Regions:
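Conserved catalytic cores of phosphodiester-cleaving nucleases, focusing on short active-site segments
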Residues: 9, 151-180, 194
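N-terminal polyanion-binding entry modules of DNA glycosylases/AP lyases
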Residues: 264-379, 385
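Domain-level recognition of nuclease-like catalytic cores that cleave nucleotide substrates
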Residues: 211-267
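Nucleic-acid nuclease catalytic cores
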Residues: 167-168, 175-185, 192-224, 246
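Short aromatic-glycine-enriched beta-strand elements
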Residues: 16-21
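Short nucleic-acid-contacting surface segments enriched for D/E, G, S/T with interspersed K/R
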Residues: 37-50
Length: 387
């Protein structure tokens, strides 16, 4: 989505939710703020902002009081229509720079770019490790009435009927983006409506448009509105799809870009995993039994590792596997050879019990390693931990 007539300015103040004072080309101007959220972390004195010159579209200007009353009516009705063609300001606030990141703060744009994106059939996201795409779209209807709410988008695609509630996200801290930045009972209501719509066969989505790029993950804002977090979590558990995409943002353009991880609860654990997993991948030891899912080989390694150093086990494990590669081989090997293969590990009763267990498997499970915890625990020499 492209904007026309963009100019750069610097934020001075915000007298109310609907207007801001911006320095543009050396003059202080009154600018329409297209986002009634708090945006306190964005609109700080001196911040570089980008505004749209709407002078060519205006047929008149409103007084300060008319503008405030009109904008308040728009906020209550949640409609995006203009107040006739009269306006008090020639400028609209579009984007703000926060550090090295440019953030689009136009609250009217997320619905538009999602609709545009769907029209181009670009929706591809990973859901439960399977690629899912909305294709074959035959209908897109904005502001769809469902129950007592208006859902942002209704989509028909082949035999699918899809409801999509779109939420713009501008609140960012250390690469983490959150919604909402202020309590929103309307957002909670919409999430509940989507959850109910599942029962009528609709496919439902909450689509978070991250109005910036380069973020790490999205999480609901527990501090600001815990009820929204709980509603979103319950909806997701019921089957509502919760997705987030970041955007490529320029001074005069915004477009949907890449999927962003959605963390609905315990973001601190996700943060920890982002540190520990890379460290583990780099520092972990290369152990042969970690390269297999064969339960027999894992079982042998578990018994060998009991009270024995890991590095010492590696060579014994390789020797044992070469001679006895499967349950059948272990069940039928002569005891002298078996004990010779175990030599150096000690605790010979362990390997004798292993052979007894292997013979149980041959008789009771036709040579196939049992699959359930209870079955495995019933084998000779296998306790709770090993099972």
């Amino acid at each position: 989505m492209k904007y026309q007539n963009i100019r750069v300015g610097h934020f001075i103040s915000r007298p109310n939710r609907f207007i801001a004072k911006i320095e543009i080309e050396g003059a202080e101007e009154t600018v329409h703020v297209k986002n009634t959220g708090r945006c306190a972390e964005l609109l700080v004195p001196g911040a570089e902002v980008y505004v749209q010159d709407s002078q060519q579209e205006a047929e008149g200007w409103l007084s300060d009081n008319e503008l405030l009353q009109g904008e308040m009516q728009m906020a209550v009705s949640s409609k995006s229509t203009n107040i006739g063609k009269k306006r008090k300001t020639r400028w609209d606030l579009i984007a703000v720079r926060k550090g090295d990141r440019l953030i689009n703060m136009d609250s009217q744009i997320p619905n538009k770019i999602v609709k545009e994106w769907l029209e181009q059939e670009k929706w591809t996201h990973n859901l439960h490790n399977q690629s899912d795409r909305i294709h074959g779209i035959t209908k897109i209807q904005p502001e769809y009435t469902y129950g007592k709410s208006r859902i942002d988008l209704y989509v028909e695609a082949q035999d699918r009927k899809i409801l999509i509630e779109v939420k713009g996200v501008t609140l960012e801290e250390n690469g983490v983006v959150r919604f909402p930045d202020a309590p929103s009972e309307r957002a909670v209501k919409h999430v509940h409506e989507l959850k109910e719509a599942l029962k009528e066969g609709y496919e439902c989505y909450v689509f978070f448009v991250i109005q910036m790029s380069g973020v790490r993950y999205f999480t609901p804002n527990m501090d600001t509105h815990p009820e929204f977090k709980e509603a979103l979590k319950e909806a997701a558990e019921a089957g509502v799809h919760v997705v987030a995409y970041d955007c490529s943002v320029r001074e005069d353009e915004i477009r949907i870009q890449d999927p962003v991880p959605v963390i609905l609860e315990n973001p601190e654990l996700y943060e920890l995993s982002q540190v520990l997993v890379p460290w583990y991948q780099k520092a972990r030891r290369d152990l042969p039994w970690r390269h297999t899912t064969d339960p027999y080989r894992i079982w042998v390694s578990e018994i060998m590792l009991q009270q024995t150093r890991v590095e010492a086990v590696k060579r014994y494990y390789a020797r044992f596997m070469e001679a006895l590669p499967n349950v059948n081989a272990l069940a039928n090997v002569e005891e002298d050879k078996l004990l010779k293969l175990w030599e150096g590990l000690g605790y010979y009763n362990r390997v004798r019990n292993m052979q007894k267990a292997a013979r149980q498997i041959m008789v009771d499970y036709n040579g196939t390693f049992p699959k359930t915890y209870e079955e495995i625990q019933s084998l000779t020499g296998i306790g709770n931990y090993t099972a």
